[in-house]
Amino acid sequence: MKSIIEVKDLSFRYKEDQDHYDVNNVSFHVKRGEWLSIVGHNGSGKSTTIRLIDGLLEAESGEIWIDGQLLSSENVWDLRRQIGMVFQNPDNQFVGATVEDDVAFGLENQGLPREEMKKRVAESLELVGMLDFKNREPARLSGGQKQRVAIAGVVALRPAILILDEATSMLDPEGRRELIQTVQEIRKDHQMTVVSITHDLELSLIHI
């Protein structure tokens, strides 16, 4: 199966005068539809690697290929549309007054027809079990519910790649398992590639 992410000899440091690299000569690939867990302690370069893949940071050396295209300053915005990211604290991602408005926000930026937008919002909220909460304020949801809404907002955009950057670290063990199970179902149903960043080795094995 063809690789949708290919990283070759990637190196990066936040300051040029640093003695050490935050990411040093890293290479890996992810096949379409796979689930890759990147596990490591805080400060090991996990999130930095993901930000390089998403084009939020620029590598000092090496190559990043997304779906057969070499990531560059010319195509970074186009390739970024293929990637959806969910972060540790979903409160930083919410922009809508209601759950429904928040999931619709990204679709509005894409200029989708209103009926198609409503359909995608409903489908995405249904997928994560949050359709009954569509009129709630995101701030009034539990931690697990907030993460489900954040995932729905990403899934509605139909990216080829979903990146979870410590997205379950603020949840209790049961909430983590439920969220991972939900993402696993979405991955299978939509042939989505998932990259999960975590420091929890046990959590990285749940989806297997």
Regions from the language model: what does each represent?
Residues 158:
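Conserved catalytic motifs of ABC-family nucleotide-binding domains
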Residues 206-208:
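Conserved small/polar residues in nucleotide/adenosyl-binding loops
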Residues 137-141, 145:
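Conserved ABC ATPase signature
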Residues 39-41:
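The feature captures the beta-strand-to-loop junction immediately N-terminal to the Walker
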Residues 54:
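Helix-to-loop junction immediately C-terminal to a conserved catalytic motif
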Residues 115-133:
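Conserved ABC ATPase "signature" region
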Residues 162-165:
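Catalytic Walker B motif of ABC-type/P-loop ATPase nucleotide-binding domains
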